[in-house]
Structures are given as C-alpha cells and as structure tokens.
UniProtKB/Swiss-Prot annotation:
Keywords in alphabetical order: Ribonucleoprotein, Ribosomal protein, RNA-binding, rRNA-binding
Domain of life: Bacteria
UniProt key word Ubl conjugation: no
Name of this chain's protein: Small ribosomal subunit protein uS8
Record has Ribosomal protein as a keyword: yes
Family statement: Belongs to the universal ribosomal protein uS8 family.
GO molecular function, one term: rRNA binding
Role played: One of the primary rRNA binding proteins, it binds directly to 16S rRNA central domain where it helps coordinate assembly of the platform of the 30S subunit.
Subunit: Part of the 30S ribosomal subunit. Contacts proteins S5 and S12.
PROSITE patterns reported in the protein's UniProt record: RIBOSOMAL_S8
One of the GO BP terms on file: translation
Gene Ontology CC terms: ribonucleoprotein complex; ribosome
Length: 131
C-alpha cells in the first residue's frame, strides 16, 4: 500500500498515540520526518526521538511528553498537503495562538519554526501547526 501523505500519517500517529497515553510511537523514517521530530524536540513538545533499523528499514521512534498526565501537544494539524501546497513568505507565515504554538516550515535553509524563519528572513512551505 502506498502512502500519499507521509507527514499527515506521522502527525496522526502522534495524535492517536497521545490520545491513548502511549509512552512512544514508531513509524517509517525519512529525512523530513526526522527534521520535524528535531523541531518538536527543540520546542519541547516531545521528549526524544531515535532512528532504528527494523528488518533493514529505518523506523523513527518518538518518545511522547506529558505534563500532569495530559499530553503536551494539544493540537497538531497538517496545513500544506499534496493536493494543495501552501507556501508563505517570511512575513506571511501564520502565528499560532499568539506565539504560544509553533508553525513548522520547510525552507531553503531547512525545516524550522515560524520564529526562526522570520528571523532568517526566509519563507517556505507551511507543513503543520503545533500547540
């Protein structure tokens, strides 16, 4: 079975795992998924992530984070999708919850948060929003 949107699948796996209070979640790995996981870790939304080979295929394992028994990630949504790509300039990147959340953007300088993209003066594809 081919997967038409692996990023949406990643976000859905995280959302579903947190709704059932799982400690970790695993999924097929890619460079983009690892970059998104690195941004989530830097922003404090997940504890850690690692890549392991399972039957010769890389698997991304994400350790989820909870605070007082509740998931740290309250909202995680895909913005740009294969059927409708969303690109924004550095001043047009949306701000999530007045700066309390982050928008993850894929730029020419790598995957980064909306704040870092504005500081670097680059725009790009708006991958997802996390709050």
């Amino acid at each position: 079975m081919s997967m038409s949107d692996p990023i949406a699948d990643m976000l859905t796996r995280i959302r579903n795992a947190q709704s059932t209070n799982k400690v970790s979640v695993s999924m097929p790995s890619s460079k983009l998924k690892r970059a998104i996981a690195a941004v989530l870790k830097d922003e404090g939304y997940i504890d850690d992530f690692s890549v392991q080979d399972v039957d010769g295929k890389p698997q991304l394992n994400i350790s989820l984070k909870y605070y007082a028994g509740r998931p740290v990630i309250e909202k995680i949504e895909r913005v740009s999708r294969p059927g409708l790509r969303i690109y924004r300039g550095n001043q047009e990147i949306p701000v999530v919850m007045h700066g309390l959340g982050v928008t993850i953007v894929s730029t020419s300088k790598g995957v980064m948060t909306d704040r870092k993209a504005r500081d670097a003066g680059v725009g790009g594809e708006v991958l997802c929003v996390v709050a």
